[in-house]
Design a protein with these regions (language model features):
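Hydrophobic, well-ordered secondary-structure elements that form the walls
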Residues: 284, 308, 338
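C-terminal amphipathic helix plus adjacent low-complexity
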Residues: 153, 255, 317-400
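Nucleotide-sugar donor-binding catalytic core of glycosyltransferases
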Residues: 1-51, 60-75, 88, 93-99, ...
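Acidic (Asp/Glu)-rich catalytic clusters
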Residues: 77-81
């Protein structure tokens, strides 16, 4: 079986995030197939136009070109020349779905893997008359990469961890609605508290971003990590709402969310209930780090007060939560519950995800041919050389 994964990356810092790399490379690692990758950032391939595959997967990084709102996603018409059954993986589906649907229809994408888990949201974002989809399958935005797993007995005991509360996030644009504000609010609330007896490593500063292996080391050095559900509560199908928000904030830079909501978002707020468990939750579980999370459903993966300490969104139970955080034995018990239950059942691994994509993407599991042409050897060689060049470029930028 031959699979082509089409992605888009300029090898910025995002490329070095574990969540991105593990998702992208999961097909090459876990599919029982010959898997080839093509980065549309480089250039189009005349040779590739003449090839055929059993399955063509448009990765979410490719679909993310919708964020430019300049039709970038629609400028890859040449990809339609490649023969094969097409599927797509989508994320951040609350934004510019019109362009996505136009792409899906033109390229005759048959199956979409979506982070939506509510039928009414799927119908809103992907109305049938705008695409040729046969089905939409709900998946998570990230999974557990087993190659990154350490056995529980090899992870740091909580007594040896130097940081009590750890968190990294950014100030999300208010255009995503009230739901998305939780990421920054939870950080600000904890930073506002006077906790001299606890060691905090909490930041919303982009300069404090942690990538790669260092991210897992930071998690393993912390007893507790904060978190919220990912998603948005506002639907912006063509990007026009985002433009209105930008214009309003340009003229009113100190405006609060309440003011923005009253003047711009009011009719759109609550139009969508797009929320999902964050890949960060799985990373915390993998390092046996106790999570303090806002109340939520977390894609029905986690159980409150068994797999995480629940913090009310209005922070009304913050005093009790702080008492639990100070209880080192309790935090380690919660973390271990999550590790044994979530890691132990193997239901949320990238192996399972890849199987979901392939089994739902293909019409049948028949025997397939293999493509061993010299083109792919040449293509892979050029790909790795290009990645290496970009890494050197980034290193030089930070050193010099």
């Amino acid at each position: 079986m031959d699979i082509l994964v089409i992605f888009h990356s300029n090898y910025s810092a995002t490329f070095f995030r574990n969540t991105f790399k593990d998702h992208l490379l999961s097909f090459g690692r876990h599919a029982d197939a010959e898997v080839y990758y093509f980065n549309t950032f480089i250039k189009e391939s005349n040779y590739l136009k003449r090839q055929s595959f059993d399955l063509i997967i448009y990765h979410y990084s490719f679909m993310a070109q919708k964020w430019s709102c300049n039709g970038a996603l629609l400028k890859h018409n040449w990809l339609k020349s490649i023969k094969g059954r097409r599927v797509a993986i989508a994320q951040d589906e609350y934004f510019n779905s019109n362009e996505v649907n136009e792409f899906l229809k033109y390229h005759d994408v048959k199956v979409l893997f979506s982070c939506c888990d509510r039928l009414q949201d799927i119908k809103l974002i992907y109305p049938k008359h705008l695409n040729n989809l046969e089905k939409v399958i709900s998946v998570l935005p990230g999974y557990i990469e087993t190659k990154n797993l350490k056995p529980l007995n090899r992870l740091k005991k909580h007594v040896n961890r130097k940081v009590d509360i750890f968190y990294r996030a950014r100030n999300n644009s208010m255009v995503l609605g009230k739901l998305s504000l939780g990421k920054s609010r939870i950080a600000k609330e904890f930073l506002f508290l006077e906790l001299p007896h606890l060691t905090l490593d909490i930041s919303l500063d982009p300069d404090d971003t942690i990538l790669g292996e260092q991210w897992f080391l930071s998690l393993e050095n912390a007893r507790v990590v904060l978190g919220v559900e990912g998603g948005a509560s506002v639907f912006d199908p063509d990007g026009s709402l985002s433009s209105r928000v930008d214009e309003y904030m340009k003229n009113n830079p100190e405006a609060s969310y309440s003011e923005l909501n009253e003047n711009v978002l009011k009719e759109s707020e609550g139009s969508l209930d797009y929320k999902t468990i964050s890949p960060r939750s799985f990373e915390a579980i993998m390092t046996n780090t106790c999570q303090v999370l806002h109340e939520g459903s977390y894609s029905s993966v986690l159980t409150p007060n068994k797999h995480y300490i629940q913090l009310n969104k209005d922070f009304s139970n913050i005093k009790n939560v702080l008492l639990l955080i100070e209880n080192q034995e309790y935090c380690e018990k919660i973390a271990t519950n999550a590790y044994r239950d979530i890691i132990g059942n193997n239901a949320h691994t990238y192996e399972k995800f890849v199987d979901i994509v392939i089994s739902n993407g293909l019409k049948s599991r028949r025997e397939f041919r293999h493509n061993n042409s010299r083109f792919w050897l040449k293509c892979q060689s050029k790909f790795h050389l290009y990645v290496f060049a970009q890494i050197i470029k980034i290193i030089r930028k930070y050193i010099y």
